[in-house]
Regions:
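Activity-critical C-terminal alpha-helical subdomain
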Residues: 96-182
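Short, surface-exposed loop/strand segments
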Residues: 1-88
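Short glycine-/polar-rich loops that comprise or flank the Walker A/P-loop
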Residues: 7-8, 89-91, 123-128
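Acidic beta-strand-to-loop metal/phosphate-binding motif
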Residues: 11-14, 89-104
Length: 183
């Protein structure tokens, strides 16, 4: 999958590993619903994928920063891995994060370091899109408990674990599948 084959690129800068799994699975389901093929590029160390259709190919790149406070440093990744490796591609950047609370003011993600991040990637990005979950992403994911259970390979009758936070509940579900692996 060479960069010269594609004319569009989608760069997902996600807050953490859970968001990465969520958005990759969501993208996979969207592609399947639209009859598009999504495949991982096994020739690179980057999280690089291709969406193939009758109209051509789109490059998808994913970077997980593992903390919303580190997301502002991802302009370097975008410049190196996306634009640097594929200068001929028109890029749309998705900033994927959760606000941690349903009533958080999303405008804080347009100020300070966040404004500098947007400014840093804007010259090379055709468009910058916020994909902000107005809660913890784990709480959003658990709104579709049957889908989560199916994804984890758990029986449909598995009950929602106890806990106040979605992350705690999701961790308990994950441990039912992989008790000896870190969440």
């Amino acid at each position: 999958m060479g960069g010269s084959e594609a004319c569009r690129g989608l760069a997902f800068i996600v807050e953490g590993a859970t968001e990465k799994v969520f958005y990759l699975e969501y993208l996979s389901q969207l592609c399947a619903a639209k009859g598009l093929a999504l495949r991982k590029d096994l020739d690179t160390q980057e999280d690089r994928y291709a969406i193939t259709s009758a109209n051509g190919e789109k490059v998808v790149m994913m970077a997980s920063v593992n903390s919303v406070s580190q997301m502002t440093n991802s302009a370097t990744w975008f410049d190196r891995a996306c634009v640097g490796e594929n200068p001929e591609i028109a890029w749309t950047v998705f900033l994927c994060y959760d606000t941690d609370e349903y009533n958080s003011d999303i405008t804080k993600f347009h100020e300070g370091d966040w404004a500098m991040l947007r400014e840093s990637i804007s010259p090379a990005a055709q468009k910058v899109v916020d994909l902000a979950a107005k809660a913890d992403i784990e709480d959003v994911m658990l709104c579709d408990l049957p889908g989560v259970l199916s994804f984890l390979g758990l029986p449909p009758e598995t009950e929602m674990p106890l806990g106040n936070k979605g992350k705690t509940k999701l961790k308990k579900l994950y441990r039912k599948v992989a008790p000896n692996k870190a969440y």
